[in-house]
């Protein structure tokens, strides 16, 4: 029979290794894909335990017939579909442990037919918690398998619910099949990264390890300053910009920043973050990179032939999409590209194309995901001078 240990080892595969051994494991794993890796260390996360600012939890029956908030095994391994408690897992933020415990108590003591343990399938399969390290903001997103339901809304806005969660100040959103409903507060929280503050909505992407993200962005800033050749007309392209975090972070050393992303909600959030941080020299564009990058470079050169161009890309775990790699290769004026990757497999795949025009000249490995095999890569790519061949 499956057990909580099975679930813990699936979520946190390296949890039984001491931390220095975890870092060695990550480095060796990366070298399997990149044998000529330009570094021999993985920088440690500032926080090894309790580091996550976002987690999704399953809701369902435990093996003791109790409604439980935690994790279940994949279907092929979970014959009973039990959900196992998550509160002892090392990656949870302390507030998450507190919230999970209180909401679990509420669900057990105020049971409803739409998620009852007496029924085969719950209509409340999961919840997500987003929290912050520097602002104390918290948001809970409940997922409901069905259209908007006033009974469900009233349940999570009842006095009894808030009596149980007591002093925790939270924002609550319910994701129905046909809409998202704000039950309490807002559908966003705020988080600080060094001197900057960012709005994070229920749909936003934001790095899951806040303290390590500050290290990550400072490393990107250091590398950018190391390789940029200031002319007074320095232009940055923040590709796959999401909510604008990296572009905003680097904006102080560039004349102009263009953030490009295909997700409209991300661009809306990015523009809000631009105003929140009073960054006048950044422009966010909702469009495929393939459609606008070369055009933007041409327009900048028309305005000022002395313009220099730098790019940073932080794609999702699946890597670059479509023809982005070829689009980047087709920009002769783009001398440097910093590739930030959380997946060495897709980075290697993308480099099979980017490597036709760019070569890696510096790499930093940083642990954003303690107790798991995952690791963040920062790779500086420089345009190859093909004229010498």
From Swiss-Prot:
Q: Which GO terms describe its biological process?
A: methylation; RNA processing
EC top class, in one word?
transferase
Q: Where is the active site?
A: 342
* Key words, A-Z: Methyltransferase, S-adenosyl-L-methionine, Transferase
Q: Which InterPro entries match?
A: MeTrfase_TrmA_AS, SAM-dependent_MTases_sf, TRM2_met, U5_MeTrfase_fam
What Enzyme Commission number(s) apply to this enzyme? 2.1.1.-
The Swiss-Prot or TrEMBL record annotates one GO molecular function as: RNA binding
Q: Which Pfam families match?
A: tRNA_U5-meth_tr (PF05958)
Has UniProt tagged this entry with the keyword Zinc?
Answer: no
Q: What positions does the entry give for S-adenosyl-L-methionine binding?
A: 207, 261, 314
Q: Which domain of life is it from?
A: Viruses
Q: Which SUPFAM superfamilies match?
A: S-adenosyl-L-methionine-dependent methyltransferases (SSF53335)
Record family assignment: Belongs to the class I-like SAM-binding methyltransferase superfamily. RNA M5U methyltransferase family.
* Designated name of the protein: Putative RNA methyltransferase R405
The organism named in the record is: Acanthamoeba polyphaga mimivirus
């Amino acid at each position: 029979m499956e057990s909580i240990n099975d679930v813990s080892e699936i979520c946190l595969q390296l949890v039984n290794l001491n931390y220095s051994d975890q870092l060695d494991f990550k480095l060796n794993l990366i070298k399997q894909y990149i044998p000529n890796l330009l570094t021999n260390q993985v920088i440690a996360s500032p926080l090894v335990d309790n580091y996550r600012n976002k987690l999704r939890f399953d809701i369902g029956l435990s093996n003791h017939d109790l409604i439980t908030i935690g994790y279940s095994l994949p279907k092929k391994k979970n014959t009973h579909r039990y959900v196992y408690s998550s509160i002892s897992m090392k990656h949870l933020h302390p507030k998450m442990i507190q919230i999970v415990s209180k909401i679990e108590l509420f669900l057990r003591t105020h049971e409803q037919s739409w998620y009852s343990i007496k029924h085969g399938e719950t209509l409340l399969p999961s919840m997500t918690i987003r929290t912050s390290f520097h602002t104390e903001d918290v948001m809970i997103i409940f997922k409901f398998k069905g259209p908007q339901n006033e009974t469900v809304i009233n349940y999570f806005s009842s006095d009894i619910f808030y009596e149980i969660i007591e002093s925790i100040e939270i924002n609550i959103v319910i994701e129905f099949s046909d809409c998202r409903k704000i039950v309490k507060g807002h559908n966003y929280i705020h988080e600080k990264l060094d001197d900057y503050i960012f709005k994070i909505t229920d749909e936003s992407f934001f790095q899951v390890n806040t303290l390590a993200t500050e290290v990550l962005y400072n490393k990107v800033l250091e590398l950018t300053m190391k390789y940029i050749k200031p002319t007074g007309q320095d232009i940055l392209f923040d590709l796959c910009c999401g909510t604008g975090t990296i572009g905003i972070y680097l904006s102080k050393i560039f004349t102009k920043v263009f953030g490009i992303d295909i997700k409209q909600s991300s661009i809306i959030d990015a523009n809000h973050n631009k105003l929140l941080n009073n960054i006048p020299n950044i422009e966010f564009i909702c469009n495929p990179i393939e459609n606008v990058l070369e055009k933007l470079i041409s327009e900048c050169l028309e305005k000022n032939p002395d313009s220099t161009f730098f790019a940073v890309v932080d794609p999702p775990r699946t890597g670059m999409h479509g023809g982005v790699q070829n689009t980047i290769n087709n920009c002769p004026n783009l001398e440097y590209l910093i590739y930030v990757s959380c997946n060495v497999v897709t980075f290697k795949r993308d480099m099979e194309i980017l490597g036709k025009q760019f070569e890696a000249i510096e790499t930093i490995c940083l642990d954003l995901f303690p107790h798991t095999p995952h690791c963040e890569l920062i790779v500086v790519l420089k345009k190859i001078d093909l004229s010498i061949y």
